[in-house]
UniProtKB/Swiss-Prot annotation:
GO terms for cellular component: cytoplasm. It comes from Plasmodium berghei (strain Anka). The gene is TCTP. The lineage of its organism: Eukaryota, Sar, Alveolata, Apicomplexa, Aconoidasida. This is Translationally-controlled tumor protein homolog. One of its GO terms (molecular function) is calcium ion binding. Involved in calcium binding and microtubule stabilization. Keywords: Calcium, Cytoplasm.
Amino acid sequence: MKVYKDIFTNDEVCSDSYIQEDPFGNAEFREIAFEVKSNKRIKGNDDYGIADNSEDAVDGMGADVEHVIDIVDSFQLTSTSLSKKEYSAYVKNFMQRILKHLEEKKPDRVNIFKTKAQPLIKHILTNFDDFEFYMGESLDMEAGLIYSYYKGEEITPRFVYISDGLFEEKY
């Protein structure tokens, strides 16, 4: 299994157990980012056969049950809010940091990043109100943000990751 980690914090943010798709259904963005679909799951309500637990049940589920988004729960992502102005300042700094990283570690990616990043960020800024932003476990604002949005009538969000802000680790 491959786990994707943030290049600046080593936070685990995704894995290859999620099918990667073109971000926002746009193949143009595929060279710079990927999108995965999340699912909801039930967390809690562990019954180890100690008792019948019926006194705690509400509608067939225990009081300690919660519905979670699998990616958020598995990788301990935390939602954060940013104004458009704050996001613009953040993304400018973040893109410069990635560019510097690429110049040092992957110079063959520099031109691709320069040409493909701007249309992706423009799309995010144009649709800014449709996004929720997530941070990795370290809660470091210098790290990459993860972009979440709902596609059409889907009941769970999709998550978009900037590929050059991640590295793969095999387990």
